Amino acid sequence: MEKHLLVAVGDEYASSLSLRYVYGFFSRRDDVKLTLFYVSPKTPSHAAAATGQGQDPPRCRVGDAAALPALEKAKSWLLDMGFPKANVFTKTCRSDQGVVKDIIKECEAGLYDAAVLGRRGLSWFDEMFTDSVSHKILWEAVGFPIWVCRNPDQNRKDVLVCLDGSPQCLRVADHAGFILAGEPAHDITLLNIRAEDSADPGPVFAKAKEILAENGVAPGRVRTRTVTSPNPSQAILKLAKTENYAAVAIGRTGDRPQALMEHIVGSTSLKLLRKLEGAALWLCK
């Protein structure tokens, strides 16, 4: 089944990390649609329009690659790398609510299968952890997967899907299955980090395998692994590095905004977000 990803593009070189990751990850590029999305800052004319002093131009435009060197350069690079021209789209949007909120708004409106952010995307995430309102937007209102790419290594393979039995982690398995069903370059490892007295992870693995099979992933492409550790994030980071995984997929929670800071600080997903390099972090709620 065809996948459609939103790839955030910025002016600086670092934003190319998301492009490099997408190129390196997919071997069947005919099955992937990419929308390159650029959020431009507000200009004086936009501000005047917002206050009724001018005509408000369209907030988002499709196909404006020629108007923005960053978009045109990104699109040309992807075409040179083998992505079909018919599968690569460009879209510009003047900032309305701030870059992060504008990306969220576009992803929800466009029904993308994931949003892909590079290093600049990581800095946007860091900003979100300093503001309670932004916390709420990221950890509650975002209903689509987010891929964060920090120094991606194109020689890495396979996806490490972290499971703890929560609904969020089962949705991670569903997302990984959808992305990888028609992508033979990568297999899946289901990982359970457990304490000494934890319950048998067998039922969790069985449910995840069932979800993967429903997505069309052959059983032979799925492995399971159990690690006993009191520090889940450290164990995941070590495994991702030693086994050279291309992606680490993990669920994220945030169902109670009043307890958000207590939940997020020190969470496994936050530690991975800040420390994982070489592999992309796939976050699903």
Question: For the regions a protein language model found, what residue spans apply to each?
Answer:
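A conditional alpha-helix N-cap/helix-loop micro-motif detector
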Residues: 15, 96, 169, 229-230, ...
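Short histidine/acidic/glycine/proline-rich micro-motifs that form metal-
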Residues: 94, 121-124, 194-198
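A short acidic, glycine-rich active-site loop
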Residues: 55-69
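General small-molecule cofactor/ligand-binding pocket signal
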Residues: 35-37, 89-93, 147, 189-191, ...
